[in-house]
């Protein structure tokens, strides 16, 4: 199992349970049944490496959720997974939510596992780049 948390957000409990069942041996999985619950989990438990959100949920849609997550936790890699797609939804998700991947349901376990491996690699790159930049800045300040 990886040390990186992945948060799945979907208003359909059976989908969350299926993801957890398929992936729990390999990944550290957290789940939320709404965008509001996801934000609360992140507030209490801290950021996760990857968030996978459904698009259409009551209260707050996935684009709004991922936009807030990006503002609060810029290192978190974001994935949109939805059964209902149209061009405007995809464009809004990419432009507003700055997502890593936009995928449609259903998605097979092998494809999902591969996607999550890629997302964790992206998270590692983001955090390593920021750490390197921080160390470079500290070194520059010390030289001055």
Language-model segments: what does each one mean?
Residues 4, 13-31:
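Two-component/phosphorelay signaling modules centered on CheY-like receiver
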Residues 10, 54, 82:
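Active-site residues of response regulator receiver
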Residues 13-14, 31-40, 62:
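Helix N-cap/capping motif at the beta->alpha junctions
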Residues 40, 63-75, 92-95:
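Short amphipathic alpha-helix used as the core "switch/output" element in two-component signaling
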Residues 46-52:
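Active-site beta3 strand of CheY-like receiver
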Residues 57:
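Receiver (REC) domain active-site loop signature in two-component systems and cognate sites
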Residues 85-88, 106-116:
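C-terminal output helix
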Residues 115-144:
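Acidic/His-rich, divalent-metal-binding segments that scaffold phosphate/diphosphate chemistry
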């Amino acid at each position: 199992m990886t040390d990186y948390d992945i948060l799945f957000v979907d208003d359909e409990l059976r989908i969350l349970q299926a993801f957890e069942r398929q992936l729990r041996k390999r990944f550290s999985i957290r789940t939320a049944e709404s965008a509001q619950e996801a934000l609360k989990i992140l507030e209490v438990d801290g950021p996760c490496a990857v968030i996978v959100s459904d698009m259409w949920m009551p209260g707050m849609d996935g684009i709004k959720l991922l936009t807030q997550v990006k503002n609060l936790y810029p290192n978190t890699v974001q994935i949109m997974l939805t059964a209902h797609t149209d061009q405007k939804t995809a464009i809004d998700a990419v432009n507003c939510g700055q997502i890593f991947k936009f995928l449609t349901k259903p998605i097979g376990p092998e494809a999902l596992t591969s996607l999550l491996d890629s997302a964790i690699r992206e998270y590692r790159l983001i955090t390593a780049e920021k750490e390197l930049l921080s160390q470079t800045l500290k070194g520059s300040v010390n030289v001055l």
